[in-house]
Amino acid sequence: MKLVIIVAASNLIAPFASSEEIALGNTHAPVTLIEYGSLTCSNCIKFHKYVLPRVKKHYIDEGTVRFIYRHFPTSDAAVHGAVAAQCAGKSYYEMLDALYSTVADWYKAENKNSIFAKQAAALGLNSEAFLSCLSDAKYLEDVVSQQNAARKDYDVTGTPTFVINGKIVRGNKSFVEMKTLINEAIN
């Protein structure tokens, strides 16, 4: 009977966070913080500018939190940015940082791919391979699939939405609020 319960519980955890996802922090951290965000969402931009660096310093770098960013684009521009982040591969989080900090430069740009390619080159990525990736439909499908899974698994309808050790938290959060939520998850 215990084996059945363990197997059933592991099936519930599976969609929560895969060890294969590109993440910041220790894979075995006691807290997993997932953000469903959109690169053009003003509250997501604020989170990445003001809150995430502090969460990283106090929790991720200390091995207490594993952070995973999943795309939930709320505009066509955010879809393009999400694909660019996916195409950055192991430089995924560096590209997310670049995209969030330069959203005003690419949000309404006619040729977003040109801007994304410059950002990729600045990260040391192969520009030709990166541009080829941007036109690969697989990455767009991955972004759409991530968004559909978010709707199905966590009833995500807007951004930012956070999942902290399985607990769904919606809306903009300050560092103090995030700290409280993380500490609750630790205890």
Predicted regions, residues:
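Serine/threonine-rich low-complexity intrinsically disordered regions
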Residues: 2, 8-9, 18, 61, ...
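Short N-terminal micro-motifs specific to bacterial/archaeal maturation
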Residues: 24-27, 32-35, 86, 107, ...
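C-terminal cap of thioredoxin/glutaredoxin-like
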Residues: 38, 52, 118-187
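General secondary-structure edge motif
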Residues: 21-24, 35, 39, 64, ...
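Structural alpha/beta surface segment adjacent to cysteine/selenocysteine redox centers
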Residues: 39, 45-121, 126
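A structure-centric signal for secondary-structure junctions around beta-strands
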Residues: 28-30, 81, 158-159
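Glycine-rich, flexible loop/turn motifs
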Residues: 12, 18-20, 80, 102, ...
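Extracytoplasmic thiol/disulfide redox context detector
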Residues: 2-75, 141-152, 183-187
